[in-house]
Amino acid sequence: MNEAPIPNRVAESSLVAFDLEDFWPKGGIRAIRLTEFAPNGLIREADVREYVRNLEKHTYDASVVCLEGADEVIVPQWLGPMIATALAGHAVYVGFGSAPEVLSAYYAQTLAQADWNAYRGAKVLLKGCGTHPVPDSAYAAAALHLAKVAQKVMYGEACSNVPLYKAAGF
């Protein structure tokens, strides 16, 4: 009996994968609790300078840094820039809020700066079901950018996906 091999349609498809996990910060997500240097809820410049001076900056390499606890202390406007400049060259993003909030802002900035031309006219699969907690807002932002350049956008995996967008004329 001579059986023909079963074709692997997924491998043979012209789908181009777009994986938001490729943008996940290599150093992960790190948090700095503002209450650590704010006795009685008051942040003083001298305390912050001391904190920054003793900060082991290498531990923030390639990470997204969340400045948490802003609702528990009085936050001067210079605080974010002071910590961000101290971590420049180490952290990829510094922002105020919880990990999900700051991660959403990081993805928004990163995706806004991405080069989408590689997906022009392509059938793109926006991959889901990853190992990291990529924010839902990142999926929406990626779909928005992809719909501007791609022929077709789908969400999920190659073997099981949800059609999201199809350009006119296709």
Q: What do these predicted ranges mean?
A:
Residues 56-58, 115-118:
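Short, flexible, solvent-exposed loop/turn segments with mixed acidic/basic and small polar residues
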Residues 116-140:
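Extended, charge-rich low-complexity interaction segments
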Residues 79-117, 156-163:
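Long, charge-dense
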Residues 64-70, 95-97, 123-129:
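Short glycine-rich or small-residue beta-strand-to-loop segments that form or flank ligand, phosphate
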Residues 52-53, 112, 137, 145:
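A domain-level signal for the structural core that forms small-molecule/cofactor-binding pockets
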Residues 70-77, 129-137, 160-161:
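Gly/Ser/Thr-rich loops at beta-strand to alpha-helix junctions
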Residues 80-86, 137-146:
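Short, aromatic/basic amphipathic alpha-helical patches
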Residues 1-80, 84, 90-93, 150-152, ...:
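N-terminal, charge-rich interaction modules
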